[in-house]
């Protein structure tokens, strides 16, 4: 029996080569276990030993492992031994034995390589198959719940597989990296990815990115890592070029190309990319199809894979419906030599009747379906034919949940209704456009001229700025959107109070309502506060107001105090409340019953510290407070009355209340805010990201110097009428590494160029208004070097700037999106041709900078700045006394609002021209259907 037992079993003496004995531990560093008792193994205890004796079945080892088959059944001397020594990673070997005996083992990102290496070395096909299957599933599955492979582990797996495991492991690593590119490009180890692995990933058909710019960003991150872009040898330069040549430059947004034009890895391609995009913007869909060569037109096809969940095409005016169609057709479609003819037939007949159109599309266009796509952004893609787009999207993206189509003037309400009919699972739509500067109830107008279906699943609808939407159209939308939870109609000036009330009555699930700059008034409040009646013999005593979590009603006038009080007292669940520029009073705000408020805006109201303190004390989770322009915050007592809460409430006590909460993230304040207020606020300010201080506050230099240490996370600083100095500004700009916005308006004190000589690569927005009178062209050049990534710049009162600063701006900030220049010397004395280098401009404000702007500027600007939406000019700067206006019906236009100011031409007693005084403003508003011209007294 003993001899039989020796033949049947073998003792494996497994020693961990990496084991380090602890002198303080027991002298016994070996443990004996049996493979027959795997179920009772205590792995944590076993792994604490440096050596393990495992009693295993000889036959099973021979059958399951080619290594032990050769060792125990061949001619090796060990074949007759009952003890076999094995030097291997202890945990990996024990897991291998468990696999041999049919037990499940857990594979993780970190354990895969040791297990795979063990399986290869010991020749265990079962474990090899398990490892391969695990990696295959992760490389091909759409299940987001599956574990992730850490990038550092993936690199090691790929390198090992390349050397030892043939093709399948490297191929799966490449596939995994391609599928998860959006995730791994922000990984700290992304710079360690070998060139070959990255190149194979970029070329892989499953490369999944939200947009082409995400791919470029990833490549630039990789190139920047480890100083790859400095002193490159010729071979590395070739690698860089090879990588960047995989980018589809025709799909990049203009602002992105311009903004990256100074990046070392991208600069060689920037000019040709802009030239290509500009060429495509002028090319109709049918011409684009005609220009393509045989085979799949890779360079103009949007990257879409079975793993795509988000498609971001925003900011690409060069895209037309042909580009999208080419992207959702299979490669096999382009094998047919007649593919151009069938595609052109579809593009030329978008207005055919529905039945005929369906026949054409099904017969000639085998459109692919990408069921994983949940979100699409086509904002600022104004050349798209939305009839074609909707038909194709409805077939290709059946699971679409969110659609953002902002700043598109050619999308009508009828288009929206068609969207709702074609996308049954759509829950969120954003059709935002620029809010008109004309508020009918405020403007002093001289003259003005013109122009039952199934329910939708829409829960969020944004119509901000859609001044073309009237009562009838919003009612039509609400009839199919009864499940609305979020509605944004900010700036929809044509809507009546009665219409808004009707929508509220129909959409009983509303919990977020944005109605700023509308006619929202008495009727709407009655609808919000009315009891909701249900149909199934059930009465819900709650009102819509009682379920509201967000209500923004800035500049809504004509609301009585009684109605406002009724609304406030019903809003116990409110989280975000905006009462800016309303008639809200202390007595109304004090009745606010909520305790979950996270954001409160009472700017430009008569609210005092007393009422504010009452609200803050009841809402400890307040994260955003906006209270600029509240002059009553200076008063300690209101109307001589006392209150049960406190007869005298100071700002310091209010900020002490804030300090008891979870911490402020955003603060806008003015009257009554001082050094002592800030001291009281300091415990609550450590998480502050945004601070805006306006008229009536008195921070002083000391507070500015405290900002970096007190608020290290600050991203935005806006100061109006505050005392500043070089030392304070230097402290802020050198210490706040997250700062993205700096605005100094009408501040006093001495600052110089020294404050701006520090590197600020993260700064995106800079406003210097009446604070840098000394600025010269050379100073501006220094600013372009210190802040190379600015996208928004506003300069006011820089009297020494000349027209020579235009090329400085264009070359220094080619990706500029918003540019405001007012009373800046003679910048436009010789025209504005040198500004055309800022090709991505969307917002341009030029006023009192020199009378050299050509009469044709507006016409030229729409061509030179294809993304331009907002323009503000002044007749004082017109070279020929006026400006030509673009045609009313211009296809694919993005320009929506033009403001032209005129000044009085008064002269002083000595015959010299006096300082210009505003007289009137002509506002031209294109809403996608009509061009409206309005002449106002106000300066906008």
From Swiss-Prot:
Domain (BTB): residue spans on this chain: 41-109
Signal peptide: none
Any Gene Ontology biological process: protein ubiquitination
SUPFAM superfamilies: POZ domain, RNI-like
rRNA-binding listed as a keyword: no
Pfam family, one: BTB
Organism domain of life: Eukaryota
Pathway linked to the protein: Protein modification; protein ubiquitination
Keywords attached to this entry: Ubl conjugation pathway
Described purpose of this protein according to its UniProt entry: May act as a substrate-specific adapter of an E3 ubiquitin-protein ligase complex (CUL3-RBX1-BTB) which mediates the ubiquitination and subsequent proteasomal degradation of target proteins.
Record remark on domains: The BTB/POZ domain mediates the interaction with some component of ubiquitin ligase complexes.
Name of the molecule in the record: BTB/POZ domain-containing protein FBL11
């Amino acid at each position: 029996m003993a001899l039989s037992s020796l033949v049947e079993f073998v003792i494996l003496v497994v020693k961990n080569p990496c084991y380090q004995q602890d002198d303080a531990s027991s002298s016994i560093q070996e443990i004996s276990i049996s493979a027959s008792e795997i179920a009772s193994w205590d792995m944590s205890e076993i792994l604490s030993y440096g050596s393990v004796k495992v009693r295993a079945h000889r036959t099973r080892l021979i059958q399951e492992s080619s290594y032990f088959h050769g060792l125990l059944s061949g001619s090796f001397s060990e074949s007759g031994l009952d003890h076999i020594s094995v030097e291997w990673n202890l945990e990996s070997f024990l897991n291998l034995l468990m696999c041999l005996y049919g037990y499940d083992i857990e594979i993780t990102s970190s354990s895969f390589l040791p297990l795979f290496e063990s399986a290869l070395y010991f020749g265990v096909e079962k474990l090899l198959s398990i490892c391969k299957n695990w990696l295959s599933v992760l490389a091909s599955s759409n299940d987001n719940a599956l574990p992730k492979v850490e990038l550092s582990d993936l690199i090691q797996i790929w390198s090992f597989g390349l050397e030892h495991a043939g093709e399948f492991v490297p191929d799966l690593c490449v596939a995994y990296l391609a599928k998860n590119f959006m995730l791994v490009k922000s990984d700290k180890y992304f710079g360690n990815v070998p060139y070959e692995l990255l190149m194979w990933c970029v070329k892989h058909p499953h490369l999944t990115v939200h947009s082409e710019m995400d791919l470029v960003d990833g490549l630039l991150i990789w190139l920047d890592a480890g100083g790859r872009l400095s002193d490159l040898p010729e071979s590395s330069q070739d690698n860089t070029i090879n990588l960047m040549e995989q980018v589809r430059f025709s799909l990049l947004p203009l602002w992105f190309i311009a903004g990256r034009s100074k990046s070392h890895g991208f600069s060689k391609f920037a000019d040709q990319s802009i030239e290509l995009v500009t060429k495509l913007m002028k090319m109709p869909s049918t011409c684009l199809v005609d220009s393509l060569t045989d085979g799949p037109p890779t360079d103009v096809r949007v990257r879409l894979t079975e793993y795509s969940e988000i498609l971001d095409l925003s900011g690409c005016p060069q895209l037309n419906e042909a580009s999208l169609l080419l992207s959702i057709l299979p490669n096999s479609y382009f094998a047919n030599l007649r593919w151009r003819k069938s595609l052109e037939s579809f593009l030329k007949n978008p207005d055919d009747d529905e039945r005929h159109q369906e026949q054409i599309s099904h017969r000639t266009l085998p459109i692919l379906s990408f069921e994983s796509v949940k979100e699409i952004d086509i904002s600022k893609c104004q050349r798209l034919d939305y009839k074609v787009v909707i038909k194709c999207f409805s077939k290709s993206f059946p699971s679409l949940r969110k659609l953002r189509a902002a700043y598109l003037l050619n999308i009508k309400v009828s288009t929206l209704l068609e969207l709702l009919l074609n996308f049954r699972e759509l829950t969120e739509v954003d059709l935002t456009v620029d809010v008109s500067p004309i508020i009918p109830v405020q403007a002093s107008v001289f003259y003005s001229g013109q122009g039952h279906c199934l329910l939708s699943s829409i829960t969020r609808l944004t119509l901000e700025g859609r001044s073309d939407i009237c009562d009838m159209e919003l009612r039509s939308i609400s009839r199919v959107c009864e499940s609305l939870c979020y509605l944004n109609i900010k700036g929809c000036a044509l809507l009546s109070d009665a219409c808004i009330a009707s929508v509220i009555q129909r959409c009983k699930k509303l919990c977020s309502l944005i109605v700023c700059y509308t006619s929202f008034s008495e009727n709407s409040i009655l609808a919000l506060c009315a009891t909701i009646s249900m149909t199934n013999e059930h009465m819900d005593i709650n009102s819509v107001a009682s379920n509201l979590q967000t209500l923004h009603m800035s500049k809504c006038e004509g609301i009585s105090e009684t109605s406002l009080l009724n609304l406030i007292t019903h809003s116990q669940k409110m989280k975000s409340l905006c009462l800016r520029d309303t008639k809200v009073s202390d007595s109304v705000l004090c009745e606010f019953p909520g305790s979950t408020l996270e954001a409160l805006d009472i700017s430009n109201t008569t609210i005092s510290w007393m009422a504010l303190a009452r609200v803050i004390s009841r809402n400890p989770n307040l994260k955003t407070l906006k209270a600029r322009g509240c002059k009553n915050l200076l008063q300690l007592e209101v109307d001589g009355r006392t209150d049960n809460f406190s007869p005298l409430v100071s700002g310091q006590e209010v900020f002490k209340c804030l300090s008891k909460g979870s911490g402020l993230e955003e603060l806008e304040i003015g009257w009554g805010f001082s050094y002592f207020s800030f001291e009281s606020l300091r415990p609550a300010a450590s998480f502050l990201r945004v601070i805006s201080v306006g008229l009536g506050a008195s921070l002083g230099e000391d507070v500015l110097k405290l900002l970096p240490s007190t608020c290290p996370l600050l991203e935005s600083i806006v100061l109006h009428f505050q005392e500043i100095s070089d030392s304070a500004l230097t402290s802020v700009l050198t210490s706040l590494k997250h700062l993205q916005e700096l605005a100094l308006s009408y501040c006093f004190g001495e600052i110089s160029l020294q404050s701006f000589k520090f590197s600020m690569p993260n700064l995106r927005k800079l406003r210097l208004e009446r604070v840098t009178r000394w600025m010269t062209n050379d100073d501006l050049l220094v600013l372009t070097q210190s802040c190379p990534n600015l996208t928004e710049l506003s300069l006011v009162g820089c009297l020494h700037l000349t027209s020579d600063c235009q090329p400085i701006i264009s070359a220094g900030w080619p990706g500029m999106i918003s540019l405001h220049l007012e009373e800046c010397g003679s910048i436009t004395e010789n025209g504005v041709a040198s500004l055309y280098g800022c090709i991505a401009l969307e917002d341009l404000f030029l006023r009192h900078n020199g009378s050299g702007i050509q009469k044709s500027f507006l016409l030229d600007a729409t061509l030179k700045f294809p993304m331009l939406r907002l323009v503000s000019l002044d007749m004082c700067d017109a070279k020929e006394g006026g400006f030509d206006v673009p045609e009313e019906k211009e296809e694919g236009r993005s320009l929506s609002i033009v403001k032209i100011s005129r000044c009085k031409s008064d002269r002083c007693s000595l015959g010299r021209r006096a300082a210009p005084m505003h007289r009137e403003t002509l506002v031209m508003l294109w809403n996608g259907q009509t061009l409206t011209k309005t002449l106002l007294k106000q300066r906008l």
